[in-house]
Amino acid sequence: MVHPYLFLNFFRELLHPLGFSEAGADAVVYTWLIMIGLVVLSIAATKRLQAVPSGLQNFMEVIVGGIENMLVETMGEHGKPFFPLVATLALFILVSNLIGLIPGFFPPTANINTTAACAVVVFVTTHIVGVKHHGAGYIKHFLGPIAWLAPMMFFIEVIGHLSRVISLTLRLFGNMNGHELVLIIFFGLAPFVVPLPMMLMGVLVSFIQAFVFMLLAMIYIQGSLEHAH
C-alpha cells in the first residue's frame, strides 16, 4: 500500500535507484526512524539512573517491568535470557503500530515485509533454542509418541511450524494494513470528524496486536524448551 499523506515521502526518490518500491521505501524509512527513536529514548531514560525513579526512567521501568513480569509468568524464570528479544520485538511492534495514528507517519507493520521479518526472527530463534537446549533430541518434537506414525507426524509438524510464520506475519499485517486503509479513506471523506473514533480504536488494536505477537513468541520459544513426549 502506498500512503498518499506522508512527511518523509521524499525518501522514495532516494531509495528508488536501490530497487525499493514506494511502499517498501516508506517501510524502510519509518522502521529506521522508530529504531533510532527507541535507541535515543533508551539512552535518555538510562543516562542518569536513580534509586527512586522519576520521569522518563520511571515510565520506561513500568513498561520494561511489565514485559518482564509477563515473560516470567509465561515462560518461568528460565525465560529471562530471552527478555531482550521479546522486549525488543514488543516495543518495536507497539511503536510501529502507534506511529501510524499520527497524520503523516506510516506504520512499518502495515507492510508485509516488516511483519514477515519479525515472524522469521521468532521462527529462527525458536528452533535455534530448541537445538541448543536438546541437541539432536530436538527432532523428537516433530516425531510424536508413536513410532510407526513418526513419518506422517514429522510432515504435519513441519507444516505446523511453517504456518506459524505465516500466521504471525498475516495477523499483524492484516490488522494494521486494514486499519491504515480505513483511516486513509475516512481522512479523505471527513478529515477532522470521522477519523477520531477510528484512531481511538486504533490505539486499542495497536496494543492488542503487539501483545498477541509478544505472547505467541514467548509460547513458541517455551515450547522448544520443553521435553518431547
From Swiss-Prot:
PROSITE patterns per the UniProt record, alphabetical: ATPASE_A
Q: How does it sit in the membrane?
A: Multi-pass membrane protein
| Record field: transmembrane | 25-45, 82-102, 104-124, 142-162, 181-201, 202-222
Kinase among keywords: no
Top-level taxonomic group: Bacteria
Q: Which Pfam families match?
A: ATP-synt_A
UniProt-annotated location(s): Cell inner membrane
- Please state what the protein is called: ATP synthase subunit a
Main location per UniProt? membrane
Keyword tags = ATP synthesis, Cell inner membrane, Cell membrane, CF(0), Hydrogen ion transport, Ion transport, Membrane, Transmembrane, Transmembrane helix, Transport
**Any one Gene Ontology cellular component term annotated for this protein:** plasma membrane
- Entry's Gene Ontology molecular function annotations: proton-transporting ATP synthase activity, rotational mechanism
